[in-house]
């Protein structure tokens, strides 16, 4: 079976590998296609696409937009036009908000005796500074044992260095993806702790605004949950997608292509996704 992975993060957001490393890794894993779905940015796609030329590996343009619906919600977008002006303007606003939040985080850390500057972090980590980078700093200063420990103790919602972010409404996320010629998909539906009834309400709400798909296979979902999501996708006439949600060493127990061993997304799902392209 030809396998694919439609949920991957690079250093353009909170992943720990470059787009070129992702392509090399995907080829080692024998994948037929991957999607670069960085958080709130499309900056990682072109380098991955270029690296894959002549290798036979398909690279799908994608994004993962953060929003909220009775709590956190993520919307994936596939086959978006990366040059869409409306999308680019909205993403620029998200970048500006992230910089403001990062500067506030640095200021909080400075008050607690950490000697660092945001400018130095951008030199070290690149223009996209995120949660794993702050976690790495906390580990280096001896405040945490590892990155996951730092995030759970200091950077999660309600913790010492957490700064709330501005979020787009879910209907706006879907609209942006559709207007950019893309296919909107609810990411990892069971991560939001919905009961079955609430999940159905979420799907119906998003479908009313143009939702086209459901991520049915994900590293954090059990076999039973993944089977149920496939039934829901069929019931609602939604396209199925799936992926590992790979972040590299940021999430060391998740492997590209298979997640924790159970993801295994068939190429036929990508073929169905392609049918929805504008």
What kind of feature is each model-predicted range?
Residues 1-72, 155-156, 168, 172-251:
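An N-terminally biased module of ancient metal coordination in phosphate/nucleic-acid-related enzymes
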Residues 237-243, 248-274:
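C-terminal active-site subregion of NodB/CE4 polysaccharide deacetylases
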């Amino acid at each position: 079976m030809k396998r694919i992975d439609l949920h991957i993060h690079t250093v353009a957001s909170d992943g720990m590998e470059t787009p070129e490393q992702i392509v090399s890794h995907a080829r080692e894993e024998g994948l037929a296609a991957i999607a670069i779905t960085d958080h709130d940015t499309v900056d990682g796609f072109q380098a991955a696409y270029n690296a894959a030329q002549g290798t036979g590996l398909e690279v799908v343009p994608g994004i993962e937009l953060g929003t909220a619906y009775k709590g956190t919600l993520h919307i994936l977008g596939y086959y978006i036009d990366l040059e869409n002006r409306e999308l680019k303007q909205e993403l620029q606003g998200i970048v500006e908000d992230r910089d403001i939040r990062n500067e506030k985080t640095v200021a909080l850390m400075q008050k607690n005796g950490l000697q660092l500057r945001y400018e130095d972090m951008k030199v070290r980590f690149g223009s996209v500074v995120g949660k794993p980078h702050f976690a790495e700093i906390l580990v280096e200063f001896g405040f945490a044992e590892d990155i996951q420990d730092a995030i759970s103790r200091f950077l999660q919602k309600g913790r010492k260095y957490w700064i709330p972010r501005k979020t787009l409404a879910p209907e706006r996320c879907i609209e942006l993806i559709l207007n950019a010629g893309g296919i909107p998909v609810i990411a990892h539906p069971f991560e939001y702790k919905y009961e079955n009834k609430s999940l159905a309400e979420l799907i119906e709400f998003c479908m009313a605004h143009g939702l086209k798909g459901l991520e049915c296979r994900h590293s954090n979902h059990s076999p039973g949950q993944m089977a149920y999501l496939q039934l829901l996708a069929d019931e609602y006439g939604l396209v199925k997608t799936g992926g590992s949600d790979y972040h590299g060493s940021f999430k060391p127990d998740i492997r590209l292509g298979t997640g924790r061993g159970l993801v295994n997304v068939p190429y036929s799902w990508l073929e169905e996704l392609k049918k929805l392209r504008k």
